[in-house]
């Protein structure tokens, strides 16, 4: 949330193009962060699936014994 507040609080004595640049960089950072979050979620899901498969394999192995 803090990132959104920053561009609004920027001092107005900056030149207009500087202000625009600042808000652009912050929004691109937000996009980056969101992409990273998405990747992490995907990885977490993959890990959970792997753990489930491992558990199933263990169960099968016990059944054989």
Curated annotation (Swiss-Prot):
The P gene has two overlapping open reading frames. One encodes the P protein and the other the C'/C proteins. This is Protein C'. The gene is P. It comes from Vesicular stomatitis New Jersey virus (strain Ogden subtype Concan). Seems to stimulates transcription by the viral polymerase. May play a role in viral pathogenesis or transmission by insects vectors. Belongs to the rhabdoviruses C protein family.
